[in-house]
């Protein structure tokens, strides 16, 4: 949910990924 990893946005609809 950080927003820095767009590849994770497929499971985080807030548009970010966990780092």
From Swiss-Prot:
Main location as per UniProt: secreted
Domain of life according to the entry: Eukaryota
Reported modifications of this chain: Conversion of fibrinogen to fibrin is triggered by thrombin, which cleaves fibrinopeptides A and B from alpha and beta chains, and thus exposes the N-terminal polymerization sites responsible for the formation of the soft clot. The soft clot is converted into the hard clot by factor XIIIA which catalyzes the epsilon-(gamma-glutamyl)lysine cross-linking between gamma chains (stronger) and between alpha chains (weaker) of different monomers. Forms F13A-mediated cross-links between a glutamine and the epsilon-amino group of a lysine residue, forming fibronectin-fibrinogen heteropolymers.
Keyword Hydrolase belongs to the record: no
Keywords, alphabetical: Adaptive immunity, Blood coagulation, Coiled coil, Disulfide bond, Hemostasis, Immunity, Innate immunity, Secreted
Function: Cleaved by the protease thrombin to yield monomers which, together with fibrinogen beta (FGB) and fibrinogen gamma (FGG), polymerize to form an insoluble fibrin matrix. Fibrin has a major function in hemostasis as one of the primary components of blood clots. In addition, functions during the early stages of wound repair to stabilize the lesion and guide cell migration during re-epithelialization. Was originally thought to be essential for platelet aggregation, based on in vitro studies using anticoagulated blood.
The protein's name: Fibrinogen alpha chain
Organism whose genome encodes this protein: Cervus elaphus (Red deer)
